[in-house]
């Protein structure tokens, strides 16, 4: 069911303009109007859920997720224990679905694993830029992108900012995941450690903790707190995507 449109939004000029701009395909301009609308209703649960849906339709996935997190926080504080499947599908969207699906199929990589990485890396913000310089949806470092880029057979020379292009970023990111997948025999934990901290770091940790057969114990033994959290969150994301979208 569609979340009812609050009257305060229906008569809001920002909403009217956003709807008109979205209808003619001007999604970037529509999102700017929505951002102005957000300021006036961000603490209204019904409005937040409704607005996150509009962000989603306009391609504003990261904005939608931030609003949904706000909704989730308010719902928890107000004693709401369960959230609808509709909420969770917006909270874990199949954003950039065609690019993720086609590249994952070609590289024989689990698309839910890729979705889990993108959600954790950038919250589906194609313009995301880390302090270290990682760019785009899958937060690819320029040095890594430059190594992967020749395999695309694109004629234009590589520039770091091409990593902000969603389709190309996913193409290169999935290629890199595929390389790690082959290198580490499909071990998701090892792939994620390598993706986050580097293969050389994984090699060092395997010498120290490789004897630990229990996966949870091994993950808890990861020395870098950031990498430990990253691995847990991406594996959780992958599990939720599988639960929400797997045909079985």
Label the model's feature ranges.
Residues 1-8, 17, 24, 29-31, ...:
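Catalytic glycan-binding domains that act on GlcNAc-containing polysaccharides
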Residues 11:
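Primarily a LysM-type cell-wall glycan-binding module
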